[in-house]
């Protein structure tokens, strides 16, 4: 679970269909860029782990200091989820995940799809997907939809 750092007033604005303008000194903004969402998030990474398992045994050899072993080994693969904690910033120009590992900075032109969940939001940029666990996935989705509407107005 993730505890929110988004002010309650900002969350209410987003739910009402308005984009709040938030301030931070942690993110370097481009000209005309405004922050509309700041919150703690966890980037979930699916990692494939390979293990080598050996089945067999060994016995003392004929001469001192030697061993005789027999058996066979095989590689076993399994996937596990790795959590990368950080801060998710959504501005009117880009989506930034600031973290020590697996951080990213993406502009909206590369955003392909959004899948909201109750406590997460999956964002796809081309062939790369990021599953971001947040306090409220519907708020993240609402911010992205509002920005999308504003960007389509000529």
Specify the residue positions occupied by each region the protein language model found.
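Acidic, Ser/Thr- and proline-rich intrinsically disordered linker/docking segments
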Residues: 5-6, 27, 37, 42-58, ...
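Intrinsically disordered, low-complexity, compositionally biased regions/tails
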Residues: 21, 36, 60-61, 65, ...
């Amino acid at each position: 679970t993730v505890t929110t750092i988004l002010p309650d007033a900002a969350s209410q604005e987003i739910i009402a269909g308005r984009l709040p303008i938030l301030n931070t000194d942690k993110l370097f903004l481009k000209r005309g860029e405004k922050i509309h969402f700041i919150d703690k998030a966890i980037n979930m990474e699916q990692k494939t782990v390979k293990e080598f398992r050996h089945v067999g045994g060994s016995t003392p050899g004929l001469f001192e200091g030697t061993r005789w072993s027999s058996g066979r080994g095989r590689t076993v693969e399994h996937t596990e989820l790795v959590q990368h904690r950080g801060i998710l910033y959504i501005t009117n120009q880009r989506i930034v995940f600031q973290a020590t590992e697996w951080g990213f900075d993406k502009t909206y032109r590369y955003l392909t799809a959004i899948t909201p969940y109750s406590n997460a939001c999956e964002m796809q940029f081309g062939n790369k997907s990021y599953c971001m666990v947040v306090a409220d996935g519907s708020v993240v989705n609402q911010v992205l939809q509002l920005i999308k509407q504003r960007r389509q107005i000529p």
